């Protein structure tokens, strides 16, 4: 277990030691009407909002990394979700990475989070608010068994399931990425109310947090949405395929060269950095 916690902690802090990208040199949001530009994994944002770090309903982790910027829709979603969680007495919502002041590529840890429409939220709901020291060096709680086949019963709770369900039922949310074992547990617990499960997508890692993604805002004309998830609750053969051993001869895909930036994002970099 100790090794797992260390590995998760290393994942969250590893980016601090890597070389900065040009986007990290932009220290304040670019003025203008809020516009998410490009795709979630290749884009930027004009007119980002800052998530207030002081709130009765949530706490922001790793504020020293300055990754608490996003489209106004994302800020309002976080405030809305955390308020709903408090109304239901679930606990304090712990907010992880959103995006940088102008979005763009991180130096590590994330391929997406570039257009101000993504946020990581810990799957912990502390009843006692964390100290500043805890927030700066958060201890991720691994909810998944060592073999990756199920959640750890002593760490799973109906409150965590309720938080994920609340997020999935939000009209602005298009996808929520969690570990396959977490998705599997949600499928088992859901009962007859299953429509929201369509948005909850199994993905690698995500053992201690959920990655919430919003749809492109209607007035962000250069924003590229993903196709909708397949119909259904996603609890059948597709989910089970994540638990099958790799086929013989399967190799990890090679790292791809990042595609060219959308012209508007390149122009933003040219004006503010290069």
Curated annotation (Swiss-Prot):
Binds 2 Zn(2+) ions per subunit. Zn(2+) ion 1 is bound in the active site. Zn(2+) ion 2 is bound at the dimer interface by residues from both subunits. It holds the Pfam family Peptidase_M74. Its cofactor is Zn(2+). The keyword DNA damage does not apply. One of its GO terms (cellular component) is outer membrane-bounded periplasmic space. Zn(2+) 2 binds at residues 147, 150. GO terms for biological process: peptidoglycan metabolic process; proteolysis. Disulfide bonds join 44-265, 187-235, 216-223. Residues 1-19 form the signal peptide. Residues 225-274 are annotated as: Disordered. GO terms for molecular function: metal ion binding; metalloendopeptidase activity; serine-type endopeptidase activity. Its EC number is 3.4.24.-. InterPro entries: Hedgehog_sig/DD-Pept_Zn-bd_sf, Peptidase_M74. Belongs to the peptidase M74 family. HAMAP family: MepA (MF_01623). This is Penicillin-insensitive murein endopeptidase. The lineage of its organism: Bacteria, Pseudomonadati, Pseudomonadota, Gammaproteobacteria, Enterobacterales. The gene is mepA.
């Amino acid at each position: 277990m100790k090794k797992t916690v260390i590995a998760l902690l290393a994942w969250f802090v590893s980016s601090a030691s890597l070389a900065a990208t040009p986007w990290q040199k932009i220290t304040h949001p670019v003025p203008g009407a809020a516009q998410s530009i490009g795709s979630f994994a290749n884009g930027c944002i004009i007119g980002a909002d800052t998530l207030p770090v002081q709130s009765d309903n949530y706490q922001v982790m790793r504020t020293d990394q300055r990754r608490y910027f996003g489209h106004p829709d994302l800020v309002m979603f976080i405030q809305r979700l955390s308020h709903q969680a408090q109304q239901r007495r679930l606990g304090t919502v712990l907010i992880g990475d959103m995006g940088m002041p102008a979005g763009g590529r991180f130096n590590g840890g994330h391929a997406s989070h570039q257009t101000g429409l993504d946020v990581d939220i810990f799957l912990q709901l502390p009843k006692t608010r964390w100290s500043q020291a805890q927030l700066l060096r958060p201890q991720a709680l691994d909810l998944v068994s060592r073999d990756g086949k199920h959640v750890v019963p002593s760490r799973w709770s109906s409150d965590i399931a309720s938080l994920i369900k609340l997020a999935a039922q939000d009209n602005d949310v298009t996808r929520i990425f969690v570990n396959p074992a977490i998705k599997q547990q949600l499928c088992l617990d859901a009962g007859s109310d299953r429509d929201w499960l369509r948005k909850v997508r199994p993905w690698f890692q995500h053992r201690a947090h959920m990655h919430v993604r919003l749809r492109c805002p209607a007035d962000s004309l250069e924003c590229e949405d993903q196709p909708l998830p397949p119909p259904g609750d996603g609890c059948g053969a597709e989910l089970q395929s994540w638990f099958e051993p790799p086929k013989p001869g399967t190799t990890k895909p090679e790292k791809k060269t990042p595609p060219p930036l959308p012209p508007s994002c390149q122009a933003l970099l040219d004006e503010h950095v290069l």
